[in-house]
């Protein structure tokens, strides 16, 4: 049926075209929280997407987590709106192992405008990572999905902002990855139109990963891609 988490067929058939909110998410969370849990929020849907500014779901969710903290809470986003909740996040980091994974996809803002036209500029995202870090929040600059970039410069910027090891993943589209998390098919069209097809090729992606790993090592850090990398968020 492919109907997951209370969603209806139209919700996933038109993925990315609108937002469906679970308005009672914080209430449901309060019922299910336990001290031994590792919670990842959220590998598929950004909790700080633009509509969150109006809906204000995350302050209620963070309030529930502060009242009954899990063992680990990992928060995945690319939205500068996270800074709105800096106070609750700082409180939560005193109670649990809070990790923020903040997506930095390229060092080239013209590429960001091609693939992520509605997302914040790269410079602003790097500044968010610095702000979270300076607030004492364990923050990873996550190179995912890896868009066309200068790998060495991207690694330098990410490590400079976060002061931590890096995690990430190549750009996957359903045409070359039959299972698991992928970027919308529009990315395939953008890549073809802009001459970036090689960035979808697994062999070329492996070459880029090696360059990222090498630069991270040169700067005294490490890089891990895919499940082994994201597993760092739950340790």
How does the language model describe each region?
Residues 44-46, 78-80, 103-107, 144-146, ...:
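Active-site beta-loop-alpha junctions enriched in small/polar residues
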Residues 1-99, 107-110, 122:
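Conserved Radical SAM active-site core
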Residues 58, 82, 125, 151, ...:
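Aromatic/hydrophobic pocket-lining residues that form the small-molecule binding cavity
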């Amino acid at each position: 049926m492919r109907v997951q988490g209370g969603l209806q067929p139209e919700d996933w058939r038109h993925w990315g075209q609108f937002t469906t909110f679970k308005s009672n998410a914080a209430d449901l969370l309060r019922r299910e929280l336990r001290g031994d849990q590792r919670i990842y929020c959220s590998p598929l849907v950004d909790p700080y997407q633009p509509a969150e500014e109006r809906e204000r779901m995350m302050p209620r969710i963070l309030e529930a987590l502060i009242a009954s903290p899990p063992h680990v809470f990992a928060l995945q986003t690319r939205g500068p709106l996270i800074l709105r909740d800096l106070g609750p996040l700082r409180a939560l980091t005193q109670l649990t192992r809070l990790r923020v994974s903040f997506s930095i996809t390229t060092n080239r803002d013209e590429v960001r405008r091609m693939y992520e036209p509605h997302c914040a500029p790269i410079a602003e995202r790097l500044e968010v990572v610095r702000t979270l870090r300076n607030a004492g929040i364990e923050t990873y600059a996550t190179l995912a999905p890896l868009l066309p970039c200068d790998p060495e410069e991207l690694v330098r910027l990410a490590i400079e902002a976060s002061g931590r090891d890096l995690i990430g993943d190549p750009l996957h589209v359903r045409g070359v990855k039959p299972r698991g998390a992928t970027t919308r098919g529009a990315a395939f069209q953008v890549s073809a139109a802009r001459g970036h097809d090689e960035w979808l090729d697994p062999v070329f992606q492996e070459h880029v990963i090696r360059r990222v790993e090498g630069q991270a090592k040169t700067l005294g850090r490490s890089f891990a891609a895919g499940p082994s990398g994201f597993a760092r968020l739950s340790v």
